[in-house]
Each structure stands twice: as C-alpha cells, then as structure tokens.
UniProtKB/Swiss-Prot annotation:
HAMAP family: AcsF
MF (Gene Ontology): magnesium-protoporphyrin IX monomethyl ester (oxidative) cyclase activity; metal ion binding
InterPro entries xref list: AcsF, Ferritin-like_SF, Rr_diiron-bd_dom
GO biological process annotation, one example: chlorophyll biosynthetic process
Low complexity bias (residue ranges): 33-47
Keyword terms, alphabetized: Chlorophyll biosynthesis, Chloroplast, Iron, Metal-binding, NADP, Oxidoreductase, Photosynthesis, Plastid, Transit peptide
GO terms under cellular component: chloroplast thylakoid membrane
Pathway per the UniProt entry: Porphyrin-containing compound metabolism; chlorophyll biosynthesis
Descriptive protein name: Magnesium-protoporphyrin IX monomethyl ester [oxidative] cyclase, chloroplastic
Cofactor(s) this protein requires: Fe cation
The organism's place on the tree of life at top rank: Eukaryota
C-alpha cells in the first residue's frame, strides 16, 4: 500500500511574505522569460496560432526536462510470465483507483480566468506566464513518458500498462488546463513542436522510478501548500487556477503511490547499499533543482504572499518525510546546515548567472565560471556527504494512506 502521508504543518507568519503589495521594484523589471515568441524563431518553427503567440522553450540546466528510458528492460521487469512474485493485487487495486477518475469533471474553467488575467499587469503578469509555461512543460513531459510506457507494457503486463495510460490521461488534462491558462494571457505552448524539438534525457528504469516518485510527491506538497496558504490568505488569490490545486494535487499523490508500488515490486532497487546512495543522490538533485529554480523566481512567490525559501524548505521537509517511507535512505534536510548549504548554492548560482549576462567573450566567461562551478560542486558534494537518515523498510510494511485536507 501507499505510504502514510505526514500532515502538512500550519503556515506560520514567517512563511508569509510581509509585503502586502506587489511593488514594481527594479529586481522585477530584470526578470527574463524562459520562452520566446515563435515570431522570433527561425522559419522551421510552427506557424503562430490564431488565438495568440505560440511559445517555445529555451533550454537551461534548470528547465523542465523530457525523459525516456529503456523500454525493453521495463517490459522485462514487469513481465508477469518472468516475474511470478509481482504483487498484481496491489496493482489491480491501484488500477481501480485510477479508473474512478475522481477529477474527471474538476478541470472546468469559468469567466474568472480571463477576468483575472486581464487585471494582472506589469512584472507579475510576465512572471505568471512563465509559471504557466514551465508547469505546462513539466506536465506534458510526464504525459509523453507515461503514454509510451502504457503502449510498450500492454503485452507483458496489461494492468501496469493501463495504469500508465491513465496517468498519461491525467498529465494531458493538467497540461491542457495550463495551456488554456496561457491563452488567457494571449499565449499558447506549441506542444506538437515541443514533442519533436525537445531533447530527451535517458534514465534507466530504476532511476526513472526514483526521479518520478520524487517529482510526483514534491508536486503534491507544492500544490497543497499553495492551496492552503491562499485559502488562509485570499487577498493573494490573483488567478483562479490555485483554487483547483486541492483536487489536482491528489492526482500527483496517486501517481507517486503507483511508483512506490513499482519500487516495492522490484526490491533490488531499494534494499542494498547502492540503492541508498542513489536514493540520496536523487533526493539531493530534486531538492537542489527546486530550490535554485524558485530562488530565481522569488517575485512569483512574493506575488502570492509567500516567502520563497520558507516555502521551499517546508515542501522539502514534508517530501523528505514522505519519501522516507519507501527510500532506504534520505537526506537530513531538517539539519540547519542543509539549508545553509542550499543558501550558499543560491549565491553561487546567482554569480554564475551574472557572468552569463556580461558582455565578455565566451573564453573569458568560461574562465570566470570555473571557480564558481567548482564551488557549487563542492557545496553539492558536501550536502550529499552529510550523515543520512536510514529509512524505508526492506519488508515493506503496509501503510494505509491518511490524507488530511
């Protein structure tokens, strides 16, 4: 069964940004969009939509990525003829959950969306477009991966295949809803162009399990935390998409539960020293990426009344507690030194960004980057080598999910 979810902590006053108005200070005017209108691209780009400007993504290390895997190995792992001990009953129970489709009628828009978008002006409007764009890209990435897994596993394990197909349904629904949101701002992501043009990152199946489990669970905690914060502080409810996060996050949670079941079905991914090292590596990768990403976009979180770093640490801690129920080892993220290391990484990353924005030639820029990259790697390695927390359970004790809204 899925791991029992820890209760989210009440949002404390320090969690909320004390600024009650969104000022147009100079730091907001320098924010750069990670997408550019198609009209600025080469002639190979897709024609602009009649409804608005199509957008394509500029790649950076922190951009949401598209993943692929060894589908042949995945077929072997879940082949019911080869692996007689697979816990098919758990997969069948999960399948019924997905078939119920709790959110089938949830993602219905109303006139509030366009009205809110029209009221949003200045830097906050620009930042919000970027938020929708990045979120849509991440959801669409999940759709493509799950769809292909559903197709490839049909013959070897129809139950697992159908769950992947139903998860791709959820991700497509999320991506479409977010893209509709972009249309409120007179933009749209060209998802067909993205499918063909984006670079795909290859991960072996066990790494897909680690990374995707963390991605889904951290998504749950991000969405539910934002939802609860805005429910308590409605004056920051600048766009109605946040009102959908309570039900939306349960899709993320169910997806994470499924990946938990997949890992339990392959105990070799969880019960040796190598699994402990990889588990810590993926925890650190996901947490650092989120922290650096969000600290580049503090204006967005300030715009909805959140303190970016407090919000991120809250999400990291809750995700880590949840992850500890399945991963054999996790990071000690509640050690104050862990946050200090993250904050030092933010400072180094800001310096790296500043180097990239100078007018120096590429050789000079690269020379300036070398000591900064070395310092960043040193901080990441030091965080990885902090004493971990032994966790998980090799006998996979079953936990009943207890979700509190």
């Amino acid at each position: 069964m899925a791991a029992e979810m820890a209760l989210v902590k009440p949002i404390t006053p320090k969690f909320i940004n004390p600024m009650r108005t969104f000022s147009s200070s100079s730091k907001f005017s320098t924010i750069k969009m990670s997408a550019t209108s198609q009209s600025n691209t080469t002639t190979t780009a897709t024609k602009p939509s009649k409804k608005g400007n199509k957008k394509e993504i500029n790649e950076t290390l922190l951009t949401p990525r598209f993943y692929t895997t060894d589908f042949d190995e995945m077929e072997t792992l879940f082949n019911t003829e080869i692996n007689k001990k697979l816990n098919q009953s758990e997969f069948e129970a999960l399948l019924q959950e997905f078939k119920t489709d709790y959110n089938q009628t949830h993602f219905v828009r109303n006139k509030e969306f366009k009205e809110a978008a029209d009221k949003m002006q200045g830097p906050l409007r620009q930042i919000f477009v970027e938020f929708l764009e990045r979120s849509c890209t991440a959801e669409f990435s999940g759709f493509l991966l799950y769809k292909e897994l559903g197709r490839r596993l049909k013959k070897t394990n129809p139950v697992v295949a159908e769950i992947f197909s139903l998860m791709s349904r959820d991700e497509a629904r999320h991506a479409g809803f977010l893209n509709k949101g972009l249309s409120d701002f007179n933009y749209a992501l060209d998802l067909g162009f993205l499918t063909k043009a984006r670079k795909y990152t290859f991960f072996k199946p066990k790494f897909i399990f680690y990374a995707t489990y963390l991605s889904e669970k951290i998504g749950y905690w991000r969405y539910i935390t934002i939802y609860r914060h805005l429910k308590e502080n409605p004056e920051y409810q600048c766009y109605p998409i946040f009102k959908y996060f309570e039900n939306w996050c349960q899709d993320e949670n169910r997806h994470g539960d499924f990946f938990s079941a997949l890992m339990k079905a392959q105990p070799q991914f969880l019960n040796d020293w190598k699994a402990k090292l990889w588990a810590r590596f993926f925890c650190l990768s996901v947490y650092v990426t989120m922290y650096l990403n969000d600290c580049q976009r503090t204006a967005f979180y300030e715009g909805i009344g959140l303190d970016t770093k407090e919000f991120d640490m809250h999400v990291i801690i809750e995700t880590n507690r949840t992850t500890a129920r399945i991963f054999p080892a996790v990071l000690d993220v509640e050690n104050p030194e862990f946050k200090r290391k993250l904050d030092r990484m933010v400072v180094i990353n800001q310096k790296l960004q500043a180097v990239g924005e100078t007018e120096d030639n590429s050789v000079v820029k690269n020379l300036k980057r070398v000591p900064l990259i070395a310092a960043l790697v040193s901080e990441i390695l030091a965080a990885y080598l902090m004493p971990p927390i032994e966790s998980g359970s090799v006998d996979f004790a079953e936990f009943e999910p207890k979700l509190v809204y």
